[in-house]
């Protein structure tokens, strides 16, 4: 119990430190990946997480989710860390992530008895701009979200409030990015509190092929998350209800017709929190205020950290699996976690 309390205090201190040093620290870290513009094969060490509840290792059900396993990830490769978003392929194994150093991270989740057991075939590479140079060179390093629509990948970049399109299916991590047109009011987002959530419903879903962006903590006049549907030159504005001091850190689509929001909270007294909400896509309409059911809430009594990425796939048994990842802020007292849950009820 004392060890858990000490870890909580250290993690709170780490988040405070990361918040205070974010402008200088993130940019200097981004500089370290500019020297290589080609993919680098890396080794990721994975320590299994057998239970989600620090107080009851036998417990597996948490709200509407069932814990299937997790990994704490480390690597001796210096640019590794800061995982901000993840997409998992339909096979449930291959994944693509972005980091807040402006890097791609891709690899393969290895399973044993249906549980994550390791990471194989991992590579990192700088995210490239249209000129073939790393986006970090121009200060576009804080990649926070990733989506796929109509065969193209889109990355949301905070601080500069850009969305950049890549032909990843054709060129992989060597794809060159082209900024897409975004609404002028993106310029009014709260600094470093913007494009954490970017997703696109697949064919057959409401709003199929359109980009959905929900801001982290860029709030409207009523204190709710400013949100957008982007469809070429057409823009639909709506808001997501903010509650209980949670802010949006990522999102994904739960086929066929729901939006999953991953959220986090932080305060010196309550420490770190995580929440997932399920919201019907059909509720997204011009100027609407939307909300949804809470699937899970967790704090540092559970195996969480600064949870920043969420993805969905179906396993061979037909179960819906949620994959979550955390951003360690390149801090030695935080962790890069990969957690998996099955959606089993509400």
Enumerate the language-model features and the residues they cover:
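Sequence/structural signature of beta-propeller domains
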Residues: 2-5, 12, 20-346
